[in-house]
Structures are given as structure tokens and as C-alpha cells.
Amino acid sequence: AITLVMDGKELTVEDGKTLLDVAREMGKDVPTICYHDATTANGLCRMCVVEVEGQRALQPACVVQAGAGMKVHTRSEKVIRARKTILEMLDSTMDLSEADEIQTMMKDYNTDANRFPDAERRESEIKDDNPMYIRDYSKCLLCWRCVQVCAEDAQYTYAINFEGRGFETQIGTFFDKTIPETTCVLCGQCVAVCPTGALKPRREYLLQQGMSPQEISVLNTGRKKRKAR
């Protein structure tokens, strides 16, 4: 066991826990975006950063282990400023209209939607190439959750991965194949962990587009017949 101080409170915890684990055990509201209980923590989004005295940079709580003697601040002015900036940058570059948890975070941190007015927004055509789900990468914030559950964290299918570099980075299939041409088994786990609606059940998407359940059934039947030929 180790002893540390978090937000002024001294506590003893089991060795091997992350700072996020400790914070949650204390009931602290440390926000996360890329982190999910079903995936391996990777520290990509940096929303869970906390301030550790003696460390110059803020530390991602999801991957940094609690250490003996640490003095941690989960909501200092520096932490709040960093989280707010991350949210404002995300909001200025992509469509977060269906990201309910992130919308709640933006209200909590009182973000300014106009802070980065000249930011280039991520644009992408909706990919509707399979009967299970659609892919709208204009809503994708590259949290990596879908890639992880498609790979070692759950399915071991490896149908999707990162492609491109810098601002052009996006989630895609190898050689830009359609989903039916990949190793995807349509398990739906990627859709389940997506925090923004970038991956969405196809039926839900078509209903939002104004189609009736009957029209969707006819559409799916036609797709199955074409596939059988």
C-alpha cells in the first residue's frame, strides 16, 4: 500500500492503481474521453489531466500510477484551464452535436464556442456501406476506442485502424476497403463505445433522415438480394 495526498486529503491505496482509479474511489469527477472501462488506457485525449506537485507538466490520470508521497490536485486552476482548452479545440474542429457526455463537460467548464473561429473543421462524407452501422468521420475525435475494441481489447478482428497523418489522420479500413470487404464481423462493439455518434446504428441514422421503418425494411431487403446475386 502507498500513501498520497489528493486535493488536500491524505489516503492510503493499493499499489498499482492509477490516479484516475484513486480519484474515482474518492468520488472525484475527473472527466475522460478516450478512456473507457472496456479498453486499455492510452492517455490520448488528455481530458483526465491532473496536477502533481513537483511535475512541470500535467499528468494524464488514466495512465499515471499513484506514487507514494504524491500531492495531486484534480481541479486546480491549471487543470481547469487545460481541460477547457481541449474541449474548445474539439468543439471548433468537429461536430459534437451528438456527443452528450462531452456537451455536459463543455457546460461544466463553461467553454467558449467561438474561441478558435479560424479553426479548420473536419469534414467527411457519410460512409453507408454495410447493414449494421454508418461512419460519419466529421464527428470523429480520434479517441481510438473503436480501434481498440476491434483489436486486442475485445474482438481481435483488426478491421479498422488509424490512417493518414496530422490533421488528415482518421479512422479507416486497410486500403480504404468497404466494411463488408474487411474482416469486420458486424459485432457492433465499435458502435457501442463511440462517444460522439461518428459510428451509429444504420437503422437509427435512416430514421433520423426521415425514413419509415417500412422503407428501411425494403431497403435492407434489396441490399440482401443484391448481395446474394
Segments the model singles out, each with a brief description of its role:
Residues 18, 145, 189:
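Residue-level recognition of oxygen-bearing side chains
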